Amino acid sequence: MTSIVEALVPGGKANPGPPLGPALGPLGVNIKEVVEKINEKTRDYNGMQVPVKVIVDDKKNVEIEVGTPPTASLVMKELGIQKGSGNAGSEVVGNLTIPQVAKIARMKKEDVLSYDLKATMKEVMGTCVPMGVNVEGMKAKDCQKALDEGKFDDLLANEAW
């Protein structure tokens, strides 16, 4: 029978204590090894709570699935802000650079329907609109158009998907 343990853990800093240790102990798996794998997979989400699913089959094989925090949370973390703007049309709370948008897009890669970096970056920029966050000093919608027009192709040349 397969057992599933779901928990919210601090990115890159999970430990064998609660909630993981007590849940994994009865399943007979190497808790330290599982925690190390979780920390490796969640390293990019340092300082954020990350949803993790640990799947253990009858032969004690362990599979770890890591979810990603919401895009808005990743944007706020990148900017170092607590919340978005209450007046998105008139109040700007931060400005992302194209490399920062690309970093967030790579983090969301597994959770989006887009097939390439540019399309996922446009999704991230779409999240910036109601938050009052600009990208490269311009409104996020304008930056999406600039991205489509190839304005940032030179910056993205070294960005891996």
Curated annotation (Swiss-Prot):
Q: Which InterPro entries does the UniProt entry name for this protein?
A: Ribosomal_uL11, Ribosomal_uL11_C, Ribosomal_uL11_C_sf, Ribosomal_uL11_N, Ribosomal_uL11_N_sf
Disulfide pattern: none
Question: GO CC terms on record?
Answer: large ribosomal subunit
Q: What is this protein called?
A: Large ribosomal subunit protein uL11
Matching entries from CDD domains are given as: Ribosomal_L11 (cd00349)
Record-annotated membrane-spanning stretches: none
Q: Which UniProt keywords apply?
A: Ribonucleoprotein, Ribosomal protein, RNA-binding, rRNA-binding
Gene this protein is translated from: rpl11
Biological process per Gene Ontology, one example term: translation
Q: Which Pfam families did the record assign?
A: Ribosomal_L11, Ribosomal_L11_N
Function of the protein: Forms part of the ribosomal stalk which helps the ribosome interact with GTP-bound translation factors.
Spell out the molecular function terms from Gene Ontology.
Answer: large ribosomal subunit rRNA binding; structural constituent of ribosome
Q: Which family does it belong to?
A: Belongs to the universal ribosomal protein uL11 family.
Q: Give the multimer and partner information.
A: Part of the ribosomal stalk of the 50S ribosomal subunit. Interacts with L10 and the large rRNA to form the base of the stalk. L10 forms an elongated spine to which L12 dimers bind in a sequential fashion forming a multimeric L10(L12)X complex.
